[in-house]
Amino acid sequence: MKKFLLMTLMLVFGLTFAAAQNQAEIKFDKVTYDFGTFSDDNPVHKTTFTFTNVGKAPLVINQIVASCGCTIPSYDKRPIAPGQKGTIDVTYNGTGKFPGHFKKSITVRTNGKIEMTRLYIEGVMTGK
């Protein structure tokens, strides 16, 4: 009975380990973008975060959530094949916001080995 239980545990562990080796994995070129200093006369700025699926299975972005309504992410919902690149476009709209330094986060959730990654945008908006 002990041998059977031990063999079953080893089989489950082995299958779990093998499945983990065939996961998707997201790798971003950069995780922070600095818009620098800009005037509140021109409050809308955009950037693109580029990533690669360095895993062995298709990468699916399940959800992207920004920390503020002033930050709008957009992305292609199709799976990214292993070795392929994808992008996440982020628009910051500082209209009606107080001048000064800001730092916003964008949380990316995937089916990858690391399920959650945080991206950041920051800058300084000057007043009139």
Place the predicted regions along the sequence by residue:
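Terminal connector regions
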Residues: 98-127
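Bacterial Sec-dependent N-terminal signal peptides
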Residues: 1-24
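Short, hydrophobic beta-strand segments
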Residues: 88-96
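Beta-sheet-dominated interaction scaffolds and their linkers
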Residues: 21-48, 54, 125-128
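Short, acidic/polar linear motifs in exposed loop/turn regions
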Residues: 54-57, 96, 112
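Surface-exposed binding patches on compact interaction domains or structured appendages
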Residues: 56-87
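Buried hydrophobic-core signal for structured, non-transmembrane domains
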Residues: 47-53, 90, 104-109
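Hydrophobic core residues within well-ordered beta-strands of beta-rich domains
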Residues: 45-47, 86, 102, 117
